[in-house]
A protein has these predicted regions:
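Bacterial N-terminal signal peptides
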Residues: 33-43
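Solvent-exposed strand-to-loop "edge" motifs in beta-rich extracellular domains
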Residues: 109-115, 138, 194
Length: 236
């Protein structure tokens, strides 16, 4: 993997959510800029539905491109978002504080057409996933405490496993699904963010500040298709 691609992988490992990164460069500098921008978000917490992911134009969502563009196509009639990656990596993100004391459950559905062959998700060279959903929490003025939790459909890691991202321990990965067993099925997921955060980072959390969706295959050069159902937060 060349140096440029390595840097882009580092940039997106849990910290691509803000427009400030569009021209921020990569690596540690980008991490600090992300944290600084998150620190400037409104301090009130919002609870409710995230913007629709199947409305044409995806209003409310922004896109960050890393290595080519993953094509995200809203499917209003099916109430789904189709993601198609062919050796590409870009993601959609939405910025808004959410009070996870009141609404700790993140809900979504997804369907994956295929997993990736020969990738080791615990290594930098294997940081590709047919489907993933992020939540990120700012560190306030303590920039280096900005952290991300990433729920993934892993290609080779077993379901239920958790590990630090290959590029930074400030992002942890959780394999909600793994392997080929449920390929082609639309599955509904429900995760308690506070419980998962405690397991990953050893601390409680009150607010998350951004949510993101991404299908990426730029490192492996393979292709992936996934369908996402509307994510939302709930009290139970």
């Amino acid at each position: 993997m060349n140096a440029s691609r390595t840097e882009k992988k580092r940039e997106r490992s849990g910290r691509f959510f803000l427009p400030a990164l569009q021209n921020a460069g990569t690596g540690p500098r980008a991490w600090l800029l992300l944290a600084a921008a998150l620190a400037g978000l409104a301090c009130f917490a919002w609870a409710g539905a995230l913007p629709s992911i199947f409305e044409p134009g995806l209003p409310g969502w922004k896109e960050k491109e890393f290595a080519g563009r993953t094509v995200y196509t809203p499917l209003p009639e099916e109430r789904l978002l189709l993601a198609e990656s062919l050796g590409t990596a870009s993601g959609l993100f939405f910025e808004q504080p959410v009070d996870v004391r009141a609404t700790p459950w993140l809900n979504w559905s997804w369907r994956v057409e295929n997993v990736l062959s020969g990738v080791n998700e615990r290594e930098k060279a294997g940081d590709d996933y047919p489907a993933r959903i992020y939540v990120v929490a700012k560190g306030g003025l303590v920039f280096w405490k900005t952290r991300a939790l990433t729920y993934v459909w892993a290609s080779n890691e077993p379901e239920g496993s958790m590990w630090p991202n290959a590029f930074t321990s400030n992002a942890h990965m959780i394999a909600v699904r793994g392997g080929t067993r449920d390929l082609g099925k639309m599955l509904t997921e429900k995760r308690n963010i506070r419980e998962d955060w405690m397991r990953a980072f050893g601390e409680d959390i009150e607010t998350v500040d951004a949510v993101a969706i991404m299908t990426d295959t730029d490192n492996s050069g393979q292709k992936a298709r996934a369908w996402y159902g509307q994510p939302f937060f709930s009290a139970r």
